[in-house]
Structure formats: structure tokens, C-alpha cells
From Swiss-Prot:
Role noted for this protein: Plays a role in processing non linear or branched viral DNA intermediates in order to promote the production of mature packaged unit-length linear progeny viral DNA molecules. Exhibits endonuclease and exonuclease activities and accepts both double-stranded and single-stranded DNA as substrate. Exonuclease digestion of DNA is in the 5'-> 3' direction and the products are 5'-monophosphate nucleosides. Additionally, forms a recombinase with the major DNA-binding protein, which displays strand exchange activity.
Record-given protein name: Alkaline nuclease
Chain positions of site Required for function: 216, 254, 278, 280
Recorded name of the encoding gene: UL98
Family, as annotated: Belongs to the herpesviridae alkaline nuclease family.
Organism expressing this protein natively: Human cytomegalovirus (strain AD169) (HHV-5)
Keywords: Endonuclease, Exonuclease, Host cytoplasm, Host nucleus, Host-virus interaction, Hydrolase, Nuclease
Length: 584
């Protein structure tokens, strides 16, 4: 299940023991122990190689402490670089005044053998860092790709938790940018920042988070079959993607399309026009089917019915603001449509946006307000029921046919430029060809339509998706054969998916749920998805990324008394994100 170790990471006590290895030597202590006496040339070592060296050291200590290999593919690749004769020769020539080639080779061999260096061996990691700095850039990117592979499974994987300790993750970027709360520089917790101890048990997790965890798999299938119409996503998900240009920013993504796992190492390859779907399950809208607002959606299935449902909660899921009004940060969807959402005006009192965002907020609102969400309404029924509505039956089979045929067979058209709302043609239904549907609750599409709602750039989710898009774009840029000729339309795009469920009726209790040809044992039935495209301003992304990287490096420099250099490739990102001037 884990792919990195035979240890049972469902055991919080075992995971806590592993994290104690990190706690015994956090990043700041490692840097001071290793480099305070070797500051000559340290300024030229980018944080990317320091991060890779530190990861290798922690994983080696975990092996010695527990006798179990962890992140073996990453460890093997770093050890191979440490034994590379060409890199050793260059290193020996550049630092001949400090040590002989034999001494350097001996130190690197100890690193490759993962020897215990508690007795005066900290110089070994000075040489490893310098050697990694000499390695070609694509080799460094490959090492970060291996860390992503080693952390797949996310919260169920100890490597994922360890890597987040020293990462400004997408979920924590908003606080790092707005308030200067810097996760990972000095302390960390199981969510990636701000605290000193991991709390892995779900006993204290809120009902809303538990609800999202239970239903995320079903929502992913609905997106695959009804939004992407059977195009293949990244199976088994991705781990933590650490920005290969800074070594600091990181993102864990819910659902990706246009990202492949290639070669024997199964490292990721980002294709043109990749898509990221960030999933949010709206627990606060869980209602019974007989609820009048739910019935209104199922009966009318139009924008007005959905708007009424969203406004039925004391904190409406879509906040209305006038064209020139500043939104609050309470909800992640906004609307300027007074006819549908006027009632929310009095419920959320606007505040001044935080200072780092104030100059850019109007432009971000302008870019996103032109976008419209797509709503897909669902219901479920027993296929064995008497049914005079042939259209509903056809709709069921159309979606299942795509999931079973186009998704598995690949289909002829796998480009990702098309609109997520493009619907496939219906497929004729035949009972005798689909016996697996009988006796189960089959999810089918009732209707789809537009909703005048767009993402709120003041909300923390906007910043979470900003970092997801930025990090994935950097992997695409770094692996592109001709980065100077990248078409900005080929960079990854991000969509926000809001999923609303309903409770089961008495006749639906105990029945398996079938969606996209897959069986689910969810307690609830999907009612609707709201799919919202997210637009980013490359100039603002550069400002936000640069602010956080600079703030974090200065903070760590102060703690370690070392000149920490965190590389910043936001300018290259901007160049790739804007249209190129037309040649005369």
C-alpha cells in the first residue's frame, strides 16, 4: 500500500516515532551543524540542493533507527550521483585547497553507504551538497520527481508528512503571504506548518473533513466521467510536488489530468494543457431528499433552484457583491448577479483586504468575474424499477459507456483543450448488456447548466490553487524541450469543484452506489457538482511567490546565521504565462 516501507503507517504511534527522527535534527540544526564551519562558498549553494541533502540525511537516519528502507528509489539515485566519478573529479579540482580527491571520495562513499556520522562526520554532507550543486539541472529535477513518487498516498505516507515539515505547502501559502506565518522554518505539524507535533489520528478531525475524505473518491469519478468525459486521470494520485526551482514551495493535488507516470521509475511527466481539479465537499449542505430546497433542485434543475439551495444556509456558499464592492474572505465563490444572489449582501460584512493583496485584488476580481461555473445535477435510482422515462435511462448508460469504453480504451481524442462542458453523444441502452447495474443505485446526470458564480481571489483556497498551478507549471517548464517557445495556453489550468450530497431515502439504504462503472459504499448520494474555472494573474503570482520566498529565506538566515539562498524562478514563469509578442 505504501510503496516506501513495510511499516504500518496507520499506527499513529509508529508514525510519531518516525517523525521523532526529524525532530531530533530539524532543518535549521542540520544547516548549522554542517555549514557554520564551512561558510566559504555556502552563499553559492541554492536551497534546492540543501533540501535534497537534508532529505537524504533524514531518510538515512530513519534506516539506521528502524532498520527499514524508506524512499529507496530516491536514496539509490542520490547514492549513484555521490559515486559518479565525473562529478567527483570536478569537485576535487574545484576544492583541491580544502581536501584531496581521495578524502572527498571517502566522504562521499560514507554518504552513499549511509554510514553513521555522529562522530565528526558532518563534513560528508558539505561534500554531498556541493556535488549535487554540480549535477545537471535535469538531475536535480529528477530527484524532486522521485520525492513526489515516494510520497504518493499523501496523508497515509510517512514520507509525505516528513517532506511537508520544511515546505510552504499550498494550504499554508495564504497565511505565509498575508500574515507572515511561515510553516516549516522552525516548527511543523501534521498539516505542514505551525506547531511542533504531529497529530495523525482522525479522532479529532472535524465532521466536515471526515465527510470530504469519505466522498472524495466518488467525486473524482464524477469529474472523470461527467466533466472530462472519460479521459484518463493520474491513477492512484500524486504525492507532494516540491517546486524544483526553489525547493521550498509544495503542492498536493486532488485530481490531475494530462500528467503521466513514465518509465520504470514511474516519475511524473506534465503534458501540455494539464488540468488540476481541487475538490471541496460541502458538508454544510447535506440534506434529506425531501428537503424543499433539494426537491426544488431535482424538480426544476436550473440556476435559480441552485441559488436558493446555496442561500438557504446561514452562511451562503456563494457571496453576492456589487461590481465595485470588496468581498469578504468567508466563502470561496462570488457572484455579481443581483437577481439570483442579492439576499447574501446583508450577511457578510466586507472588510479591508490584507495589505499584500490590496493592490492586486481589483485586477484578480476583474479576471475571474468573466468566468461562469458549470453545475451538473445528479440523482440515483434502481435500474430494476419500472421506468417510463427513457431519457434518464439513456443518460445513465451514456456516462457509463464512456467510463467503460473511452476511459479504458483511450478513445481517439485525448486533447485537453476542449471545454469541460462538452457533452458526449448518448449511447443506446440494453438491459442484457449491463447486468451489473441491476440491484444497485445508479448515479445519473439529470441536467447541466451555467451558474453566474466565480472564484473569490481573497479566499485562502485561491492561493492554494495558485501554488498548485505554479508548481505544476514549473515541472512543465523545466522538462520542456524549448522553454523559450512555450505557448502560455499549454500551461496547466485549475478548476475548483464544489460537491453537494443528499442523504439516502429509506428505499436507498444499504444499496451499493454505482457511478462511472465503479462501485462505491458511500452513505450519501451526489446531488450536484459546481465546477468553477480559476484564472491567475502571472504578475500577482510572481509578487506572491517572491514575497514568501524572500520572507522565508530571511527568517531561516536569522535562525541559522547562514546566508540562505532560495532561488526564485517566478520571472521565468511570467515569461511562459503571457502571450509572446507577434513577430513583425
Amino acid at each position: 500500500m505504501w510503496g516506501v516501507s513495510s511499516l504500518d503507517y496507520d499506527d499513529d504511534e509508529e508514525l510519531t516515532r518516525l517523525l521523532a527522527v526529524w525532530d531530533d535534527e530539524p532543518l535549521s540544526l542540520f544547516l548549522m551543524n554542517t555549514f557554520l564551519l564551512h561558510q566559504e562558498g555556502f552563499r553559492n549553494l541554492p536551497f534546492t540542493v540543501l533540501r535534497l541533502s537534508y532529505a537524504y540525511r533524514i531518510f538515512a537516519k530513519m534506516l539506521r533507527a528502524h532498520g527499514t528502507p524508506v524512499a529507496e528509489d530516491f536514496m539509490t539515485r542520490v547514492a549513484a550521483l555521490a559515486r559518479d566519478e565525473g562529478l567527483r573529479d570536478i569537485l576535487g579540482q574545484r576544492h583541491a585547497a580544502e581536501a584531496s580527491r581521495a578524502e572527498i571520495a571517502e566522504a562521499l562513499e560514507r554518504v552513499a553507504e549511509r554510514c553513521d556520522d555522529r562522530h565528526g562526520g558532518s563534513d560528508d554532507y558539505v561534500w554531498l551538497s556541493r556535488l549535487l550543486d554540480l549535477a545537471p539541472n535535469y538531475r536535480q529535477v529528477e530527484l524532486f520527481q522521485l520525492l513526489e513518487k515516494e510520497s504518493r498516498g499523501q496523508s497515509r505516507n510517512s514520507v509525505w508528512h516528513l517532506l511537508r515539515m520544511d515546505t510552504v505547502s499550498a494550504t499554508k501559502f495564504y497565511e505565509a503571504f498575508v500574515s507572515g506565518c511561515l510553516p516549516g522554518a522552525a516548527a511543523a505539524d501534521g498539516s505542514g506548518g505551525g506547531g511542533s507535533h504531529y497529530t495523525g489520528s482522525r479522532a479529532g478531525v472535524s465532521p466536515g473533513i471526515q465527510f470530504g475524505i469519505k466522498h472524495e473518491g466518488l467525486v473524482k469519478t464524477l469529474v472523470e466521467c461527467y466533466v472530462m468525459h472519460g479521459r484518463e486521470p493520474v491513477r492512484d494520485g500524486l504525492g507532494l510536488l516540491i517546486d524544483p526551482t526553489s525547493g521550498l514551495l509544495g503542492a498536493s493535488m486532488d485530481l490531475c489530468f494530462g500528467v503521466l507516470k513514465q518509465g520504470s521509475g514511474r516519475t511524473l511527466l506534465v503534458e501540455p494543457c494539464a488540468r488540476v481539479y481541487e475538490i471541496k465537499c460541502r458538508y454544510k449542505y447535506l440534506r434529506k431528499k425531501e428537503d424543499p430546497f433539494v426537491q426544488n433542485v431535482l424538480r426544476r434543475h436550473d440556476a435559480a433552484a441552485v441559488a436558493s439551495l446555496l442561500q438557504s444556509h446561514p452562511v451562503p456558499g456563494v457571496e453576492f457583491r456589487g461590481e465595485r464592492e470588496t468581498p469578504s474572505a468567508r466563502e470561496f465563490l462570488l457572484s455579481h448577479d443581483a437577481a439570483l444572489f442579492r439576499a447574501t449582501l446583508k450577511r457578510a460584512r466586507p472588510l479591508k483586504p490584507p495589505e499584500p493583496l490590496r493592490e492586486y485584488l481589483a485586477d484578480l476580481l476583474y479576471l475571474n468575474k468573466a468566468e461562469c461555473s458549470e453545475v451538473i445535477v445528479f440523482d440515483a435510482k434502481h435500474l430494476s424499477d419500472d421506468n417510463s422515462d427513457g431519457d434518464a435511462t439513456i443518460t445513465i448508460n451514456a456516462s457509463l459507456g464512456l467510463a467503460a469504453g473511452d476511459a479504458a480504451g483511450g478513445g481517439a481524442d485525448h486533447h485537453l483543450r476542449g471545454s469541460p462542458g462538452d457533452s458526449p453523444p448518448p449511447i443506446p441502452f440494453e438491459d442484457e448488456n449491463t447486468p451489473e447495474l441491476l440491484g444497485r443505485l445508479n448515479v445519473y446526470e439529470v441536467a447541466r447548466f451555467s451558474l453566474p458564480a466565480f472564484v473569490n481571489p481573497r479566499h485562502q483556497y485561491y492561493f492554494q490553487m495558485l501554488i498548485q498551478q505554479y508548481v505544476l507549471s514549473q515541472y512543465y517548464i523545466k522538462k520542456h524541450p524549448d522553454p523559450e517557445r512555450i505557448d502560455f495556453r499549454d500551461l496547466p489550468t485549475v478548476y475548483l469543484v464544489s460537491a453537494i450530497f443528499r442523504e439516502r431515502e429509506e428505499s436507498e439504504l444499504g444499496c451499493e452506489l454505482l457511478a462511472g462503472g465503479r462501485v462505491f459504499h458511500c452513505d450519501h448520494i451526489p446531488l450536484l457538482l459546481i465546477v468553477t474555472p480559476v484564472v491567475f494573474d502571472p504578475q500577482f503570482t510572481r509578487h506572491a511567490v517572491s514575497t514568501v520566498l524572500d520572507r522565508w529565506s530571511r527568517d531561516l538566515s536569522r535562525k541559522t546565521n547562514l546566508p540562505i539562498w532560495v532561488p526564485n524562478s517566478a520571472n521565468e514563469y511570467v515569461v511562459s504565462s503571457v502571450p509572446r509578442p507577434v513577430s513583425p
